[in-house]
Amino acid sequence: RSSHRNEVMKITPNLIDNLEYADIVRGSREDFEVVYKKDNPDTVYKAEIAFYCKDFIYTNGAENIVLRGKNDFKKEYPVVQTHTVSTIGAGDNFNAGFIFGLIKNHITRQMISNGLTEAQWDDLMHYATKFSANCCEDIYNYISKDFGAQMNLTLNK
């Protein structure tokens, strides 16, 4: 976050540790501008991320989501269009939707290590963007109870 701009040097060793442990790195344009002073997803990926982790998700507000993965996999995903009330919590709910997709599709760490298929990535991004969009539709910064109930019903299908 921009409020931590002055602490980048201090946190860099921990950041590198986290990158080394990561199976997937996800961050926003703002995050990478603060940490690396770079705002191009391919530049961030090639110069800062790919050495440590091959699966990379770059979010950029209402702009397309950029995915870079193993075996030179590249794809962009549109953001779900919605009536946006607040974007606070959008990234956290994107992550929650992504994790929901991992659980729903029984995607394991080994599967991630071997490289996900395009269909698997598509499904993960589907849930990530749905959760994020739902969160943005009100002032509470998390998904609605109705949306959560709908998603819960899909787990057993």
Give the location of each predicted region:
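Conserved beta-alpha-beta core of the PfkB/ribokinase-like small-molecule kinase fold
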Residues: R1-T43, E63-N64
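Conserved phosphate-binding/catalytic region of the ribokinase-like
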Residues: I11, K37-K157
